[in-house]
Amino acid sequence: MECLQQDTGVEAEQVQVQQQEENAVPVTSQRVSITQAAKLHNVTRQAIYVAIKQKKLKASKTTRWEIDLQDLEDYRRNRYSRAKSTYQGELLFDNEKGFYSVGQVASMLDVPEQKIYYATRIGAMKGERRGSAWVIHVSEVDRYRNDYLKKEAERKGKSLAAMREGFEALGADLLADAENFIS
């Protein structure tokens, strides 16, 4: 009889454990607030709220907005990226084909973006508009580097050399004046 009671006690414990597992919230369905979601992804609360309103991020509101962590992770993976932008069905900035954005060209040439915009505006660098974005081919980047940036560096080098000569001459004159003053 004792064995039967122990067996039923063990069975009761197993039933309780199963019920707890069924009622337990899985780790993947943890929920966070807008503020917590913004901190997790280094964006503003407004950005999270806009994503919810645009139906890009699933969230529910009881007393406050709550976002499932899995949904937040899915949103992060599928979030808008200019690298994935398309224009008429083709990648806008297809680096494999040699097409780059103004920002990418600026970092390649180690110049400010504004200089690239100016170069395209005055015609020193040819770029084409695809939608609202400037797209620049790698051949144009190389041409601009060789034709304009190297000449600019040479001009700066010549002006620096002229400045050095001027300072050396000025220094020699000052030294002579100082010697005359002392003697």
From Swiss-Prot:
Source species of the chain: Chlamydia trachomatis serovar D (strain ATCC VR-885 / DSM 19411 / UW-3/Cx)
Protein origin, superkingdom: Bacteria
InterPro entries named among the record's database cross-references: HTH_17 (IPR041657)
Lineage per the UniProt record: Bacteria, Pseudomonadati, Chlamydiota, Chlamydiia, Chlamydiales
Family matches, as Pfam families: HTH_17
Membership in a protein family: Belongs to the EUO family.
Descriptive protein name: Uncharacterized protein CT_446
